[in-house]
């Protein structure tokens, strides 16, 4: 319902001593698209950047695609996802990785469009109670991956995401918790290698454009385009 309460909108940078009220969902979407249209105008003629820490027009297109998908405006979502892929449709081939290679998500990945930096999501998902170290807490994470999500990876060892996105390990210890097997996050293995250049938190990747376009195409009745996009993405995620 576009008239339902959304979030309060604050469009000024200065502090105001006032209570804010929630704007409607429609007002929030209108403001987000207004900001993205301005970003589009400002960035459309800029040169291609050589690092991921500043947004360019490709990042604008991807975020527009995401917003239009949320709004169920399938035609616009597909249009902007295709604009992303016109600029960059490269994908990381998981078939080229090994478990010793390191992180799936890196600054130099062909998929990387924009990153806000190396926030370690692993410190809240892996370490005990969000501790800022690995050490003694390696088997006592705050969160594990749900059984429902693990079950969604239903192609077994052929699905390389089960090797590089998540991993199974024994959790618990003799004092804090009983031992049990569980699945943990591993796209960015900050606990193993220290500071990371990117995180999947606020990371824009070309893979999202494929998924946005496929979903939007399916909803517009273009099943052929949706299947082709998913197949192309799967080719980079499944064993050859």
Task: Describe every region a protein language model picked out.
Residues 6-10, 14, 29, 54, ...:
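Hydrophobic-face positions in mid-chain alpha helices that act as interaction patches
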Residues 1-45, 49, 234-236:
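Aromatic-anchored glycine-rich loop motif in surface-exposed flexible loops
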């Amino acid at each position: 319902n576009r008239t339902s309460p959304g979030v309060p909108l604050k469009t000024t940078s200065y502090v105001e001593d006032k209570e804010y009220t929630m704007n409607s969902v429609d007002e929030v979407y209108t403001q987000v698209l207004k900001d993205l249209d301005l970003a589009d105008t400002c960035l459309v003629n800029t040169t291609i950047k050589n690092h991921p820490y500043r947004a360019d027009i490709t990042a604008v297109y991807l975020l527009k695609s995401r917003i239009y998908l949320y709004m169920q405006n399938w035609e616009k979502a597909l249009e902007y996802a295709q604009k992303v892929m016109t600029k960059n449709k490269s994908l990381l081939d998981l078939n080229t990785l090994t478990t010793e290679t390191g992180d799936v998500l890196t600054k130099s990945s062909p998929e990387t469009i924009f990153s806000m930096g190396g926030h370690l999501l692993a410190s809240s998902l892996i370490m005990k109670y969000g501790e800022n170290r690995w050490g003694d807490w390696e088997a006592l994470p705050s969160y594990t991956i749900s059984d429902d999500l693990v079950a969604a990876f239903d192609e077994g060892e052929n699905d390389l995401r089960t090797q590089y996105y998540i991993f199974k390990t024994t959790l618990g210890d003799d004092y804090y918790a009983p031992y049990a097997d569980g699945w943990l996050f591993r796209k960015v293995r900050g606990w193993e290698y220290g500071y990371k250049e990117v995180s999947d938190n606020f990371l824009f990747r070309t893979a999202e454009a494929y998924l946005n376009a496929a979903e939007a195409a399916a909803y517009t009745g273009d099943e052929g385009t949706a299947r082709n996009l998913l197949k192309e993405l799967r080719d980079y995620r499944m064993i050859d």
